[in-house]
A protein has these predicted regions:
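N-terminal signal-anchor transmembrane helix specifying type II single-pass membrane topology
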Residues: 1-44
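A long, amphipathic alpha-helix that forms part
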Residues: 12-22, 27, 149-152, 191-193, ...
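Short coil/turn segments at secondary-structure boundaries
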Residues: 35-37, 170-173, 213-217, 261-264, ...
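Beta-strand-enriched, solvent-exposed domains that form extended recognition/catalytic surfaces
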Residues: 40-189
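Active-site-proximal alpha/beta segments of enzymes that process anionic O-linked groups
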Residues: 152-154, 179-379, 472
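Substrate-binding rim/cap in mid-to-C-terminal beta-strand-loop elements of soluble/periplasmic
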Residues: 239-257, 422-477
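Polar, surface-exposed loop/tail segments
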Residues: 301-303, 449-457, 461-468, 472-533
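Histidine-centered active-site microenvironments of extracellular/periplasmic hydrolases
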Residues: 305-313, 397-449, 479-510
Length: 534
């Protein structure tokens, strides 16, 4: 269950060396493809784009304005197959929001058997005491019909027939009630201010603004028309992949190091992140209950190429559950997007929805990040559009968003599709989706904040700016003028005016990802034209 560096090849046997070699050969096409695409991008910009004064102050950035259904993109769009988990096993158990594990009598009847034909047991899942990449299991507990889970929020469940044959294996997660101390600290009005809003962040890996509009039209319509969210057309990534972008957003940190000789960027990544102040720490200090959840344990922000956290980073932390679910070997669906009978993304949505429901009368900060459906394939996330819409619809219908700032985002655009070889693809890969919805009562109390968002919706912005916005919310810095110049070293809160005459350098966007450039006409006798034709 541990995701750490392997020992050196000289210290292991020859068979493992061969296996490692096969793995390297297997991954090499992906590595070479990435290198190829980046070289194509660099060549395109050097040949066809005009440098727009990266660090100067005498120009206004012209934000590229592509139609999501541009002809260049259409040939890369397709209808993704719907998720078909099938019925690899009956739904023999479920976990209710009050923490009780139940036998599903309806499923038992449909299986053609009786309750007595099954012996079921649950095993609690715990975070490993020393590793963020492992989990621990409690002692299996046999239960009859229904039983209260003892101390964990996560369980694995197995059911056997009288013959001893395994008939069912699955897992469940729920949101326990906060401890009395946490309950009181996060209760709205416990410090005399009943109006502090909660913050809900729902992220999708590799999701550009344009592709969000293409693939998730129902969710986009709900966010923009029902939640009245502001969508930021000039939002630009600050790094190649998830980690540098989310470190800018969640910590206000620039993790890039530029080689003085080659000029190339590299990323500094610590082994552990406990000593790095993250935004949820600031919310926690100010009486918020915190939650963090990702659906792909091998590719999470803080564990891919690193070791995560020594201690649990937030009050509610679902990583042990996902590690345990990935360990299940039986009753797998033919559809890799499922755990048994259930689409994997539904576990994340259910956990987030239950958290929001139980924290309705409490201040909370929730960060849920979905990777599995959106990371690799340009089109696959479309299968979850109605599920995302329904989650937000239910939250709103139940009054759970009445005092909640909702942020929906992508970290960057898709990095693997051949769309990147086109003009529109090169641009949108740099321009992630970002939408912010302020609750109505909050807007009435602070109209200048909504005005600031609207004024900046087509400005050049980066993740450093939205880190500043999160810190404003965490610290109740909501006046027309900020009480601090900034919380990090880069960035300006989009709650307040940001100049349109802003450069990528001023926004913390590396030159490699700057979109403040224009295509230019070249004379037919230009050396660059002759080079390109060669």
């Amino acid at each position: 269950m541990i995701l750490k560096h392997s020992p050196r090849c000289l210290k292991i046997n020859r068979v493992i060396c061969y296996l490692l070699l096969l793995m390297v050969l297997g991954y090499s096409p992906f590595i070479m493809y990435d290198i190829y695409v980046k070289s194509v991008e660099l060549e395109f910009y050097s040949l066809h784009m005009e440098d727009m004064n990266y660090n100067g102050s005498d120009f206004e950035c012209i934000i590229p304005d592509y139609d999501p259904n541009d002809a260049q993109a259409k040939k890369f769009l397709r209808t993704s197959p719907i998720i078909k988990c099938g019925q690899p096993q009956p739904y023999l158990t479920y976990l209710s929001p009050d923490g009780y594990i139940h036998l599903n009598q309806t499923a038992i009847e449909l299986s053609g058997r009786q309750t007595d034909d099954y012996q079921c047991m649950y095993t609690e899942i715990f975070r490993h005491k020393k590793s963020d990449d492992k989990f621990e299991l409690g002692v299996p507990q046999i239960f009859q019909e229904t039983e209260k889970i003892r101390s964990s929020a996560f369980v694995l469940v197995k059911c056997f027939l009288k013959t001893g044959k395994l008939a069912y294996e699955s897992g469940h997660a729920y949101i326990p009630q906060p401890s009395p101390e946490l309950f009181e600290a996060s209760r709205r009005g416990s410090d005399g201010d009943v109006n502090r809003p909660s913050v809900l962040i729902f992220g999708l890996d590799s999701m550009s603004r344009l592709n969000f509009m293409r693939q998730l039209p129902r969710t986009y319509h709900f966010i923009t028309n029902v939640l009245d969210a502001v969508v930021f057309k000039g939002m630009t990534k600050t790094g190649d992949n998830t980690f540098p972008n989310m470190m800018a957003f969640l910590a206000g940190k620039n993790v890039h190091v530029r080689n003085k000789e080659s000029g190339k960027l590299s990323v500094h990544k610590p082994s552990y992140f406990d000593d790095i102040p993250l935004v949820w720490d600031s919310f926690k200090t100010n009486g918020y209950t915190t939650m963090y959840d990702e659906d792909c344990p091998g590719l999470t922000i803080f564990n891919f190429g690193a070791w995560g956290f020594k201690k649990t980073p937030t009050d509610y932390y679902a990583r042990p559950f996902w590690l345990a679910m990935d360990s299940i070997k039986n009753f797998k669906s033919r559809d890799s997007r499922c755990y048994g009978n259930t689409p994997k993304h539904m576990y994340l949505l259910k956990y987030l929805k239950e958290f929001v429901t139980k924290m309705k009368d409490h201040r909370y900060f929730a960060f849920a990040f979905l990777t599995l459906l959106s990371h690799d394939d340009l089109n696959e996330v479309q299968v979850a559009d109605s599920d995302f819409e329904e989650m937000f619809l239910n939250m709103r219908r139940n009054g759970e968003l009445n005092n909640t700032v909702v942020i929906v985002l992508g970290d960057h655009g898709n990095r693997f599709s051949d769309l990147r070889k086109t003009d529109i693809g090169r641009v949108e890969e740099r321009m992630p989706f970002l939408a912010v919805s302020l609750p109505e009562e909050f807007k009435r109390r602070h109209p200048h904040l909504e005005k600031g968002l609207q004024q900046n919706d087509d400005n050049l912005l980066s993740w450093f700016d939205f880190y500043e916005m999160l810190m404003d919310l965490a610290n109740n810095n909501l006046g027309e003028k900020s009480v601090v110049e900034r919380y990090g070293k880069i960035g300006k809160s989009p709650f307040r005016w940001i100049s349109k005459k802003r450069t990528c350098g001023q926004a913390g966007i590396p030159e490699e990802y700057c979109i403040c450039a224009r295509e230019m006409q070249l004379a037919t006798d230009d050396d660059r034209v002759r080079y390109n034709e060669a």
